[in-house]
């Protein structure tokens, strides 16, 4: 139809020209066309990142160095988010600070948006959170015991007195120390307390819970056995 279509190269802007030739009746004439290609802002390109941290340990992630903008615009982080069960993320001094949720370990995925001040792009950061062994804790305090001489044997459930977020019931090992006359046997976390015949007095018993890694916690219970007339 006699029209000419000019298409600049990708992302080119500036001066350009082309020459076209018109032929009529065997006579040709060339004409140069000057073109000014005005710049148009291009969106930045955000690139995915990876990071590693330990359980309960915040990590600072510099995500911008591998993000690009062909126009040379200065990039910044506009926003960032992470599922709440995995942790929290903040933007601090142009970097992401990820704090894992308490006792969380595994893979966390942060989504962030980078901007050149006008246009944006999104990328993700995969954070590998390494598991760290947690020490068992005292879940409930064992009360001091006041008993009568030759008391009837009874039991204390150590599974409810101690807990470990890393281990389910049955994975803690229980022990007792400090007893000579208050007899204790422990099976499946149940401590059976028995008397020594005709004994009375006081003893401080220390119950200890240890996890498979050897980390442990203890609590002491004072046993007082009152004399009874025979």
Description of each model-found segment:
Residues 22-27, 114-119, 209-215:
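Short, solvent-exposed loop/turn segments at the edges of extracellular beta-sandwich modules
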Residues 12, 104, 117, 199, ...:
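Calcium-coordinating acidic loop motifs
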Residues 13-18, 57-62, 105-111, 151-157, ...:
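Short, solvent-exposed loop/turn segments enriched in Ser/Thr/Gly
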Residues 9, 29, 42-83, 101, ...:
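Extracellular ectodomain surface segments
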Residues 15, 28-30, 107, 120-122, ...:
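A structural signal for beta-strand boundary/capping segments at domain termini and interdomain linkers
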Residues 1-10, 18-19, 82-102, 109-111, ...:
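Strand-loop-strand motifs at the edges of beta-sheets in extracellular beta-sandwich domains
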């Amino acid at each position: 139809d006699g029209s000419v279509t000019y298409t600049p190269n990708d992302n080119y802007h500036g001066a350009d020209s082309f020459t076209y030739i018109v032929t009529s009746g065997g006579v040709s004439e060339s004409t140069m066309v000057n073109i000014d290609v005005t710049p148009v802002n291009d969106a930045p390109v955000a690139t995915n990142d990876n990071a590693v941290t330990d359980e309960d340990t915040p990590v600072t992630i510099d995500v911008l160095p591998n993000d690009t903008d062909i126009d040379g615009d200065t990039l910044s982080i506009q926003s960032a988010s992470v599922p709440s069960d995995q942790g929290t993320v903040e933007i601090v001094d142009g970097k992401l600070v990820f704090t894992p949720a308490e006792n969380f370990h595994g893979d966390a995925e942060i989504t962030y948006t980078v901007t050149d001040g006008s246009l944006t792009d999104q990328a993700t950061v995969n954070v590998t959170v390494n598991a760290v062994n947690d020490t068992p804790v005292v879940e409930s305090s064992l009360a001091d015991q006041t008993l009568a001489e030759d008391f009837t044997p009874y039991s204390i459930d150590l599974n409810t007195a101690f807990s470990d977020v890393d281990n389910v019931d049955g994975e803690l090992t229980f022990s007792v120390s400090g007893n000579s006359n208050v007899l204790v046997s422990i099976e499946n976390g149940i401590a059976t307390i028995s008397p020594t015949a005709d004994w009375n007095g006081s003893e401080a018993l220390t119950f200890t819970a240890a996890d498979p890694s050897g980390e442990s916690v203890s609590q002491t219970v004072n046993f007082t056995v009152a004399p009874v007339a025979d």
